[in-house]
A protein has these predicted regions:
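N-terminal accessory interaction module
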Residues: 5-83
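Amphipathic alpha-helical segments in structured regions that serve as interaction surfaces
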Residues: 35, 51-58, 102-112, 124-137, ...
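Residue-level detector of alpha-helical secondary structure
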Residues: 37-40, 85, 89, 105, ...
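Surface-exposed polar/charged interaction patches
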Residues: 42, 46, 94-98, 110-114, ...
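Repeat-associated, polar segments at repeat-unit boundaries in modular proteins
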Residues: 59-88, 118-155
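Amphipathic alpha-helical packing elements
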Residues: 79, 83-117
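Short acidic DE-rich linear segments
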Residues: 159-164
């Protein structure tokens, strides 16, 4: 009866978005009421004043008063907030090499497929990925040329070896 343990989430791929891979930790953010109010208004909600903001691991719970004076609450994705875009752009800018950038690109492709992003935010993140790729290519070309230049300089400093 108790012989075999059940393995929960056995076939679920781990770390497939920015939150579960611990690259972005939105539950540690300090989200202001004005930012939440502006974002909710941009999504089409009629917000008069923010009552309470509760940051959870994968979403945010916001209680607010609407224009009629009624209290409403809802769960919202972090991905609709401008702070999310800033954090993703910082993550992209901090990627030190092609391998890390390729991993972030793969995660972002999945994010764009699975989660609703505002179109402007999606374009800005895509442009940040492209810009970082160009920067990394330029850096790699410089290091290759520096290595070639050092190799050429090194030829002048090799000790003379006679063939006899």
């Amino acid at each position: 009866m108790f012989g075999k343990k059940f393995k929960k989430n056995r076939y679920r791929p781990r770390g497939t978005n920015l939150i579960t891979s611990n690259r972005i930790k939105p539950d540690l953010w300090r989200l202001s009421s004005t930012e939440a109010k502006e974002t909710l208004r941009a999504t089409g909600l009629d917000v008069k004043k923010i009552k309470k903001i509760t940051l959870l691991k994968h979403k945010i719970c916001i209680s607010y008063w609407n224009q009629e004076g009624g209290v409403c609450s809802g769960f919202f994705s972090y991905r609709i907030f401008p702070t999310w875009q800033q954090e993703v752009e910082i993550l992209i800018e901090k990627s030190p090499n092609f391998k890390k950038l390729q991993l972030i690109n793969h995660i972002m492709e999945r994010e764009f497929k699975c989660y609703p992003y505002p179109l402007e935010m999606e374009d800005a993140i895509y442009n940040a990925l492209q810009n970082r790729l160009c920067v990394l290519r330029a850096i790699s070309h410089e290091t290759v040329y520096d290595d070639v230049g050092m190799a050429r300089e090194w030829e002048y400093f090799k000790p003379f070896v006679s063939n006899s």
